[in-house]
């Protein structure tokens, strides 16, 4: 197989340094409302464009992103045109202490590898900063199994096969879709895959197949099928539909991926479809739509040490599109040690069909849901009317399903979750609604969970609480 190098730039090894930019070859935004330095060196700040579909008015705001590599903790300085009087750095778990160094500047220390969000004035017009460890394993651009994308912008679609690696060099921006099918496929690097050039469902290709057989020609930004798949360190910026789709996969690792969505609705962060033995960790995911969404069926999933942010949907959405192939279902799903920065701007009631929740579990299509665990989930911002947990066994009829029968749930534990809820009982509600006695919700346990609002249960029992541990 002949090697493919996108752009005729010769690969080079970066000189050893304590701090260096991860965005070489990318011009900084001239009108950015932030400037950033790390270890005294300027870091380019990139705009993630204003949403073009769904969010409107004051909610349709751009945000910005900066990243750098460092081998050790480093001082970061941020100048914010909006001022720093109300500035906060999230997630709160990071316990970032800022020092004011000027009228519009703060300094703080970041250790690799981590991601934080700087908010001068709330959730709108924020700055995402990622501190990465330096790359030590840049592949050989001449390797016939490596698709090497050099710094700069490149508009094309790519298809990957077994034993291939797509490497996005620092400063590389691939505008298009990436599809891969096979065994031992890797996507990595410090560059980006961008969907910002296309409107809602107007993408250049890929696959978008629903259980009912519906295929959307726009496709996904990244669609992967197969076994032994790794996606790490890259950015996915903007999307015309779903961002990263793992479809019919097993033995998958997604690590230190930054999904910078919000361009359109239906831009799900990571969809895990018909897949097993998948690990997602150390990643930042912002989307207008659902951020983590197991679909069709999903077994043996671990999502840990991630940061989630949804603008108009659900942080976790499990199910809705369900397909119990060969007895498969949603089993052994673990979500732990996760920071949820913000929930949907669009508030509604959990009884509504398109409810927007922190956790929405929807067994449908005669599919079994068993052994789900949400452990150590932290909510940095709670707004009036947010919904904490919504579980519905329901019948869904349309192009997405093959059955009118609802699903069922047996075993869902929520553990070590403490919500700072300054509002009334209608905020961070819990709602359980079974379709009927044949499609029950069973074994929902709250273990050391505090701060949630009113609990409502329809044709089922309320969650079984375990005492708060002091």
Region locations from a protein language model:
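Bacterial N-terminal signal peptides
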Residues: 5-15
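Classical eukaryotic N-terminal signal peptides for Sec-dependent ER targeting/secretion
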Residues: 1-2
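Extracellular/periplasmic carbohydrate-active domains that bind, remodel
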Residues: 17-470
